[in-house]
Design a protein with these regions (language model features):
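Blade-terminus and WD-like Trp-Asp/Gly-His loop motifs, strongest in beta-propeller folds
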Residues: 31, 36-45, 126, 131-141
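Short consensus segments that form the blades of beta-propeller domains
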Residues: 77-84, 144-148, 156
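Structural recognition of the beta-propeller blade-terminating site
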Residues: 94, 156-159
Length: 167
């Protein structure tokens, strides 16, 4: 295993059970979840976002037209005005030595980070499987960081070896 310290609402690369009602969440609790990662072209590294939602309050949604009975969906969601926000961490994993490091990309309070994936090749559009590659080179990747109020978006490039971020 590459990691052993993931906990609920601060897991590695997963979606946290979004779009599952509470019955499905309990039923799928022990099933393996996919990790949302992007690989370097040489497959020596991969990047992922780890989101800490442990302090974010829960939101409850009732699906009143579910059949045969209404269902409840519960997930973490920051409502306007609440101080508890999800905290996103950008991690790079090195497959050769099975280590990971967090890159310092913080610029805005309660920012969102978006990793850029490489454009899909037209020749692969009909393939059953397409690799998830990051946009950039083997040693550099591109991402965006967006302020909570959406008034500022930085397009950034990060050198994964030095950790240097250039907006």
């Amino acid at each position: 295993a590459l990691t052993k310290d993931g906990v609920e609402y601060f897991a590695y690369g997963g979606g946290g059970g979004m779009n599952e009602n509470n019955i499905e969440k309990v039923k799928n609790k022990n099933k393996r979840k996919s990790a949302n990662i992007l690989w370097s072209a040489d497959s020596r590294h991969f990047a992922m976002l780890r989101v800490d939602q442990r302090n974010v309050k829960e939101l409850w949604v009732i699906n009143s037209i579910a059949d045969p009975r209404p269902t409840l969906e519960t997930y973490k969601y920051q409502m306007p005005g609440e101080k508890e926000a999800p905290v996103e961490h950008l991690l790079i994993f090195n497959m050769a030595d099975k280590t990971n490091k967090e890159l310092s990309v913080k610029q805005f309070k309660d920012q969102n980070i978006g990793l850029w994936s490489a454009p899909a090749l037209k020749s692969g559009r009909d393939d059953d499987w397409r690799p998830s590659l990051w946009h950039g080179t083997n040693g550099k990747l591109y991402f965006t960081r967006t302020s909570r109020d959406l008034k500022r978006i930085d397009i950034c490039m990060v050198d994964i070896n030095s950790g240097t971020v250039k907006p």
